[in-house]
Amino acid sequence: MANSATITSKKGVKSHQKDWKIPLKVLILICIAVASVSSRLFSVIRYESIIHEFDPWFNFRASKILVEQGFYNFLNWFDERSWYPLGRVAGGTLYPGLMVTSGIIFKVLHLLRINVNIRDVCVLLAPAFSGITAIATYYLARELKSDACGLLAAAFMGIAPGYTSRSVAGSYDNEAIAITLLMSTFALWIKAVKSGSSFWGACTGLLYFYMVTAWGGYVFITNMIPLHVFVLLLMGRYTSKLYIAYTTYYVIGTLASMQVPFVGFQPVSTSEHMSALGVFGLLQLFAFYNYVKGLVSSKQFQILIRFALVCLVGLATVVLFALSSTGVIAPWTGRFYSLWDTNYAKIHIPIIASVSEHQPPTWSSLFFDLQFLIWLLPVGVYLCFKELRNEHVFIIIYSVLGTYFCGVMVRLVLTLTPCVCIAAAVAISTLLDTYMGPEVEEDKVSEEAASAKSKNKKGIFSILSFFTSGSKNIGIYSLLSRVLVISSTAYFLIMFVYHSSWVTSNAYSSPTVVLSTVLNDGSLMYIDDFREAYDWLRRNTPYDTKVMSWWDYGYQIAGMADRITLVDNNTWNNTHIATVGKAMSSPEEKAYPILRKHDVDYILIIYGGTLGYSSDDMNKFLWMIRISQGLWPDEIVERNFFTPNGEYRTDDAATPTMRESLLYKMSYHGAWKLFPPNQGYDRARNQKLPSKDPQLFTIEEAFTTVHHLVRLYKVKKPDTLGRDLKQVTLFEEGKRKKLRRPAKTNEIPLRV
């Protein structure tokens, strides 16, 4: 009676727990979402509401066109102010999801009589979506283990620096909403596979369509889900639920994605989409085989069917290779192919290799972005192997692919972070479950019930019951062990929170257009040279001014200065970029015809030698040389820019080719004026300034910012008398020297 009363009371406690667990989970999720949003607002508080980096400036400019001119004009937008004189079909060559999302939010807020600027919507979009990402991660992780695991994963995802780096306020890039859609699509996919519901499969397809509109990384989902299905088929786990989920997702998702202008017919004509199509066909064969298998019981017929299936799969593979070799199916693009052949971009497409985000990461950068979670990834994967349900197989595949791609390209730590957070949550929740339960009282009750049950059994049955009763919970009952493990885990979690907050605040919340440095007294000094230069361009040059710069700054010039650019961050035309690189690396007399041919009015360069800014153009110079050498190997030779010892020198030991190049002259022209005589120093390259000031003949300095970071040079017009500009410059300098010459005391002035 006592045992039954205890069990009844425990049931009452459990039912009471269910009543308060749901609102508690909702409250915790709200707190996680608020923490996710607030931790990304450092840049707005410390600086102001401003767009960061480079690509976001184009997205912001496109969003303004969308809300000002409407969706139809946005889709048909031809940008004549970029890639001069070619222009760019912007509306058909971008992923519109980010801009459409901002536009809808902007319109809804105005309908609600909330007057906001489109810039503020763009700045705060990424933090807002980070809260939704945490909730989506919760729903995905809870399918693996429990609600506690989901809450841990959501908390990790909300503040992990690997995700924060692309979702702080002002980071208005495609990834701002793409990771949210990635996790939401995966969560719905697992839901569809477990339920076998065509509704959830359709929802997965619609979210996949949203993802396609938002980010080129949708190809990761395109290949991830088919790979999951393929592995399940190899494991012999074909079910009608799997068939319904994938076919519904694939048909709706593919047809919807083909409505995006930039994607078009790629889902049925490019190599990176063929795995999804192949698995779709394979599922139809499996469905047909299982249908026939249920109708016919003959062994020989089943063998024949299996043979036919193998032949069909082999034939499909041969046809795929044949279509790929003939060009009917487009091959992998350079950016995707470089994920498999890591040296491909460096050898064949240096423009891809020149982007710092496309370099492989270091161990320190992985720890910087994921802290102790990276060590828990293999633990979580191991625990998934122990259960190995369909959803666990998905996370295992995700972990393997995410780790590989992150190891190839540091930018893809963004796609690795979600699975690391989930795997770490599985590991920690399992650890805490082991050391925080089961309760000792519960175990005593179960032992008493088992002993009472065994008393009723006699002889051999009592012995067998001892060996077969495997329902006893295994836990850690030592209080010291529990306290040590739980306290150490809590310590690591607290340190993770401190680390994430520090990294977000100090490393990822500084806009690229505004720099800051700490002075000797501990105060912050802000360096606003970029906006100073762009503001000067906007105020002091005509609207149709053509500005040449390296492609990194094209979007910023168009967004802040509103001037015409030759190249920008879209990098769709390698020849045009190589032409700019050739002009920068050629001697002045050879660069001038290129400048005149492209109607260049001003040249913008970044020189970091004064401040010690290492991301200036002289440190990017080798990439300009390599890209232009790919098209003009006889005119531009990289070896000529290195000393006989193989050193990259910019001081007096620099090679003649280096000293005569246009970029070198523009960078070091007048730089010695900021230092005492013979003490000039290049802080970015840790070398002395050249002792002889480079002289310019075809261009002249127009503006240099206060910290000597951004420099603008005006291209001279041809001489009206047809004289060589070098001779004209030397002649003018000679006249100035004559005018400055002091008059002799015994010299009699001429009478006029």
From Swiss-Prot:
Q: Which residues form a coiled coil?
A: none
Site residues, Interacts with target acceptor peptide in protein substrate:
55, 357, 620
Q: How does it sit in the membrane?
A: Multi-pass membrane protein
Which residues make up the binding site for dolichyl diphosphooligosaccharide?
411, 555
Q: Where in the cell is it found?
A: Endoplasmic reticulum membrane
Query: Glycosylated where?
Result: 569, 573
> Region Interacts with target acceptor peptide in protein substrate: which residues?
550-552
* Sequence motif: DK motif, positions: 617-624
InterPro entries assigned to the protein according to its UniProt record, in alphabetical order: Oligo_trans_STT3, STT3-PglB_core, STT3_N
Spans within the Cytoplasmic topological domain = 1-21, 145-146, 196-197, 235-239, 294-302, 386-391, 435-482
Q: Which GO terms describe its biological process?
A: post-translational protein modification; protein N-linked glycosylation via asparagine
E.C. no: 2.4.99.18
Q: Which residues cross the membrane?
A: 22-42, 126-144, 147-164, 176-195, 198-212, 218-234, 240-265, 274-293, 303-323, 363-385, 392-408, 413-434, 483-503
Tell what the record comments on domains: Despite low primary sequence conservation between eukaryotic catalytic subunits and bacterial and archaeal single subunit OSTs (ssOST), structural comparison revealed several common motifs at spatially equivalent positions, like the DXD motif 1 on the external loop 1 and the DXD motif 2 on the external loop 2 involved in binding of the metal ion cofactor and the carboxamide group of the acceptor asparagine, the conserved Glu residue of the TIXE/SVSE motif on the external loop 5 involved in catalysis, as well as the WWDYG and the DK/MI motifs in the globular domain that define the binding pocket for the +2 Ser/Thr of the acceptor sequon.
As for what it does, the entry says: Catalytic subunit of the oligosaccharyl transferase (OST) complex that catalyzes the initial transfer of a defined glycan (Glc(3)Man(9)GlcNAc(2) in eukaryotes) from the lipid carrier dolichol-pyrophosphate to an asparagine residue within an Asn-X-Ser/Thr consensus motif in nascent polypeptide chains, the first step in protein N-glycosylation. N-glycosylation occurs cotranslationally and the complex associates with the Sec61 complex at the channel-forming translocon complex that mediates protein translocation across the endoplasmic reticulum (ER).
Can you name this protein?
Answer: Dolichyl-diphosphooligosaccharide--protein glycosyltransferase subunit stt3
The organism of origin for this protein: Schizosaccharomyces pombe (strain 972 / ATCC 24843) (Fission yeast)
Q: Which gene encodes it?
A: stt3
